[in-house]
UniProtKB/Swiss-Prot annotation:
Recorded GO CC terms: cytoplasm; ribonucleoprotein complex; ribosome
Protein name: Large ribosomal subunit protein bL36
Molecular functions (GO terms): structural constituent of ribosome
Family assignment from sequence similarity: Belongs to the bacterial ribosomal protein bL36 family.
InterPro entries on file: Ribosomal_bL36 (IPR000473), Ribosomal_bL36_sp (IPR035977)
Gene: rpmJ
Natural source organism: Leptospira interrogans serogroup Icterohaemorrhagiae serovar Lai (strain 56601)
Highest taxon listed in the record's lineage: Bacteria
Keyword flag Ribosomal protein: yes
GO biological process: translation
UniProt key word Phosphoprotein: no
Pfam family, one: Ribosomal_L36
Keywords: Ribonucleoprotein, Ribosomal protein
Amino acid sequence: MKVRTSVKKICSSCKVIRRKGVIGVICTNPKHKQRQA
């Protein structure tokens, strides 16, 4: 899990999601998981 100020899709299977106002990226590759700080 990476915490970043700006979250971006890294590959084609990355999805930008919003949960309770928190923007994040979920992917099949665990290295691509991101959350916005």
